[in-house]
UniProtKB/Swiss-Prot annotation:
The gene is amt2. It is a multi-pass membrane protein. InterPro entries: Ammonium/urea_transptr, Ammonium_transpt, Ammonium_transpt_CS, NH4_transpt_AmtB-like_dom. Keywords: Ammonia transport, Cell membrane, Membrane, Transmembrane, Transmembrane helix, Transport. GO terms for cellular component: plasma membrane. The chain crosses the membrane at residues 34-54, 71-91, 120-140, 149-169, 180-200, 220-240, 250-270, 273-293, 295-315, 339-359, 365-385. Involved in the uptake of ammonium/ammonia (NH(4)(+)/NH(3)). Transport is electrogenic. This is Ammonium transporter Amt2. It is found in: Cell membrane.
Length: 420
């Protein structure tokens, strides 16, 4: 311990002027921010694991591998799309010179000197991959794998980055307060899924004579496990959105925790003890708090989470009554929960309600409406165009009945069941 103090003293003794001291401290601060962003980004990356488990548990066992593959592909192609297009589009729009400069940088030898830029790029990437993965749960069990890959590529390379650029994280053409992405990430993903669900149509047997027929998932414990895995990653999602170690907020951690609790309690009450709705309510509470996690009080976070959780089974049934087959409930869990969180931020973020202030309810409503129109409209159009380009959006009736694990990947998730 004494040796460490001497080394530190020697270091400052060698700093003979203010300039060298400032330079050393700046280097240390940059290194700390790089470390912070990478660690927080890895936590967010863990959410891919959570999504895979949450979605995997909610589909039938004949489609589990397909869900896992889609989640892997979201990440794999998302990395490439974000590197060459998405990462620069979200900050610079369609500025051709910015693209050229970025491509020169990534194809050149300047990478080691841009550690903070690359850490920020990585943190943006994991957010983008989250938005794309949300769509997977809504269109499960009947979409062609090739169609999904193309949809995911366009979301990560174009639709998500453009939405970021238009919103508060980019040029703020449509401004609203969205600290960690209730609308930018989750709302967008949920409403892109809604548009794709409408274009795709329901699974075989999901509706008979216009009446909904439940199709149960194969493993509820897996889904619950996935919800808790997502919750762990959410601390990186929200706390990491400060983007700098020096700006980290304990309030964000507290409001995130209380919203998670509120979401689970709300869904538990509204669903009358349904395990799957409660697990999804936890996620909905976390989605809703993202927008105002830095400006509402912990009690405000609890209220936001509670309302987001209460609406999950209600909105799920409304979507079902509309004849739409949202397999994993991504519309209520991400879409409407994101909208609720954004709008309530404009209320509970006000100082009169114990918030930090600096938010506008009108801006929050405008942002929510913009997200709904942008996401649903482009999700529907994209799915239709992809279907035309590939000669169909869905697998055949025979393949759907067989299950996408065998039809698309030639491998069952539980092969021991085929052994006599």
């Amino acid at each position: 311990m004494w040796g460490e103090n001497i080394a530190t003293a020697d270091l400052f003794a060698n700093a003979t002027d203010i300039h060298s001291i400032v330079q050393a401290l700046t280097t240390l601060a940059n290194a700390s921010d790089v470390f912070f962003l990478v660690v927080m980004g890895v936590l967010v990356f863990m959410m891919q694991w959570g999504f895979a488990m949450l979605e995997g548990g909610q589909v039938r066992k004949k489609n589990v591998n397909n869900v896992m593959m889609k989640n892997m592909v979201d990440w794999l192609i998302g990395c490439v799309a974000w590197l060459f297009i998405g990462g620069i589009l979200c900050s610079k729009g369609f500025d051709l010179s910015a693209f050229i400069d970025w491509w020169k940088q990534i194809l050149g030898t300047n990478w080691p000197n841009n550690g903070l830029d690359l850490a920020s790029w990585f943190f943006g990437l994991v957010f983008c991959a989250t938005a794309a993965t949300i769509v997977s749960g809504g269109v499960a069990e009947r979409i062609k794998f090739s169609a999904y890959v193309l949809i995911s590529l366009i979301i990560t390379g174009l639709l998500y980055p453009l939405f970021v650029y238009l919103g508060p994280w980019g040029a703020s053409i449509v401004p609203w307060h969205d600290y960690a992405g209730s609308l930018v990430v989750h709302g967008l993903g949920g409403f892109l899924a809604l548009g794709a669900i409408a274009a795709l149509g329901p699974r075989i047997g999901r509706f008979v004579d216009g009446r909904p027929v439940p199709i149960l998932g194969h493993n509820i414990p897996m889904a619950v496990f996935g919800a808790f895995a997502l919750a762990i990653g959410w601390y990186g999602f929200n706390v990491g959105s400060s983007l700098a170690l020096g700006d980290i907020s304990g309030l964000v951690c507290a409001t995130t925790t209380m919203a998670m609790a509120g979401g689970g309690i709300g869904a538990l009450i509204a669903s009358r003890n349904d395990v799957l709705f409660t697990a999804n309510g936890i996620v909905a509470g976390l989605v809703a708090i993202c927008s105002g996690t830095d400006v509402v009080s912990p009690i405000g976070g609890l209220i936001i989470g509670l309302i987001a959780g209460l609406q999950v089974p209600i909105v799920y049934k409304l979507v079902e009554k509309a004849g739409l087959d949202d397999v994993c409930g991504v519309v209520p869990v991400h879409g409407t929960a994101g909208v609720i969180g954004a709008i309530l931020t404009g209320i509970l973020g006000l100082k009169i309600f114990g918030g930090a202030g600096g938010v506008s309810l009108i801006d929050q409503i405008i942002g929510a409406v913009f997200c709904i129109i942008y996401g649903t409209g482009l999700g529907y159009i994209l799915a239709k165009i992809v279907g035309i380009a590939l000669g169909g959006l869905r697998v055949s009736e025979e393949e759907e009945k067989m299950g996408l694990d065998m039809a698309e990947h030639k491998m069952p998730a539980y092969p021991e069941e085929t052994v006599i």
